[in-house]
Amino acid sequence: MSELSDEASEPELLNRSLSMWHGLGTQVSGEELDVPLDLHTAASIGQYEVVKECVQRRELDLNKKNGGGWTPLMYASYIGHDTIVHLLLEAGVSVNVPTPEGQTPLMLASSCGNESIAYFLLQQGAELEMKDIQGWTALFHCTSAGHQHMVRFLLDSGANANVREPICGFTPLMEAAAAGHEIIVQYFLNHGVKVDARDHSGATARMLAKQYGHMKIVALMDTYSPSLPKSLYRSPEKYEDLSSSDESCPAPQRQRPCRKKGVSIHEGPRALARITGIGLGGRAPRPRYEQAPPRGYVTFNSSGENPLEEEGLCCRDVTSPINERDVESSSSSSSREEHAFCANLGPVQSSSSSEGLARAQGLSSEASVESNEDSDHACKSSARKQAKSYMKTKNPDSQWPPRAATDREGFLAESSPQTQRAPYSGPQDLAALLEQIGCLKYLQVFEEQDVDLRIFLTLTESDLKEIGITLFGPKRKMTSAIARWHSSARPPGDALELAYADRLEAEMQELAIQLHKRCEEVEATRGQVCQEQELRAVVESCLLEQDRAREDLQARLRETWALARDAALVLDQLRACQAELSSRVRQDQPPGAATLGLAVPPADSKGWQASLQAMSLPELSGALEDRVREMGQALCLVTQSLEKLQVLNGKKWRET
């Protein structure tokens, strides 16, 4: 195969056969370089034409398992090649053949969220309630991986939502609650699952959610089951009754060693790491020979031979990195010898099936595979396209995905002390900085705004946009340069780790801006809380003063009531004197002399009237004057008491 160019697209790469590097100057014919794809590899990397050719020849057993115990349908179902799955199903392959772990193609598709493939498999008679060696059904696998749409699809297809796995006694609802999948828990509750079911330790789904700090799920389950007894909310001796404030506390780590999760997309890179001898740290051994293979070639050698001996190279079956049991296989039914990948892999132009070969550059194998277990299969292709388009703009000489540089420590550790750069001091003016990042043409824009280097280093992305830097590329370069200046990092370059560091620095700067805003919001909230506390203290003091004023008012009212009662008694006496005086005037007869010199009668009304009849007219007149004087004094006291009540009540008494 001719050397691949940087402009080669992914379909062009997939349509070419695999090739090997036989050393510099070695003359090898094109026929010897061609390595045909077997059916399992073609199904795993999405080679529809190769699979179609194998199906049409009718010479191969489509249900045959490879050394790892996987069929072509399993690979296509796991990766998500729906066209190949449809082709194999039309050819009549078996849909319920399990792997050595007991996982059917439906379980593999469910673990990766491939909803369309699960639909095809169910249409062809796939058993929905079939269990693997752990006792997990397809519903368990998609629930554990967090694929919401797949869970809803299986529930609508009639999956048993109350099934239990035998190890811990978990139901799918318990698995979702313990893992924190809130939307999946919502689906199960809407489906009507048993929320009061307990596992082998006596814990319910609500207890598991509370134990691992998923308080939103706890509140969600409380809204769906408000009448549950409190005995279900607390397990004796094992689970404490946590308050709602526990959500702010760090949740315990979920460690479940007794239970194994379903198939993960990360198993592919791990398997490839064991094949190639490269650890998950992303560091490959350094080459011990001077000859380096050209771009686009992969070296092969026998595991027991010296890497320098190129005569031992031969073809082999391509081992898929997805099924880790492929590594354990020591023999194959084919006549070709079994060889392992050389530990010193050269640069490889990889497709979706060989992205794990990025470990040859010292990069992380897990990061080289575009995986998102918490999202559905529809999001994978768009994320992969965005990653590739981003790398074309950041580093046109490299075709590795941007996520392949997540293991920065392993990559940077490979640089020798002689190649490390000197400490970066930074440019002295704005023109030098802009020239360094390739944005010198924008110097005039900053000069018009009177922006020097000191002001430039304080600008944010929104400030640059306001000044007039509207293009995304220059704006990102400037924000990365500002972030690098503040972090005293090295200047930007063309290396892959520097491109990744630029993106991280920009994200860190944006996070710092958001943190500053949040701190300001927290300070404003604290000020509001202080104001509310002061207002509360003022209101409490006002209430205390009102209570004291009310008590004084009640005391004054009691005194006024007593004075009014005395005034009423004097008024009755005055009326009696007036009545007697009126009767005497009408009779026009002088009273007897025996009544002269009588003392003031008692205050009793009956005795008062009897004594008035015995008084003379002058005495009666004097008694009337005395009663009028007492009446005036009583009214004066009542008026004074009412005036005191006016002050306490806050308004004039006579105004009412």
Swiss-Prot record:
Changing residue 450 to K: Decreased homooligomerization. No effect on interaction with ANKS6. ANK repeats lie at residues 34-64, 68-97, 101-130, 134-163, 168-197, 201-220. SUPFAM superfamilies: Ankyrin repeat (SSF48403), SAM/Pointed domain (SSF47769). Keywords: ANK repeat, Cell projection, Coiled coil, Cytoplasm, Hydroxylation, Phosphoprotein, Repeat, Ubl conjugation. The modification 3-hydroxyasparagine is found at residue 96. Its main location: other. Hydroxylated at Asn-96, most probably by HIF1AN. Phosphorylations at Ser-5, Ser-225, Thr-319, Ser-320, Ser-368 and Ser-371 occur in a NEK7-dependent manner. GO terms for cellular component: cilium; cytoplasm. The SAM domain mediates homooligomerization. PANTHER family: ANKYRIN REPEAT AND SAM DOMAIN-CONTAINING PROTEIN 3 (PTHR24184:SF6), SI:CH211-189E2.2 (PTHR24184). This is Ankyrin repeat and SAM domain-containing protein 3.
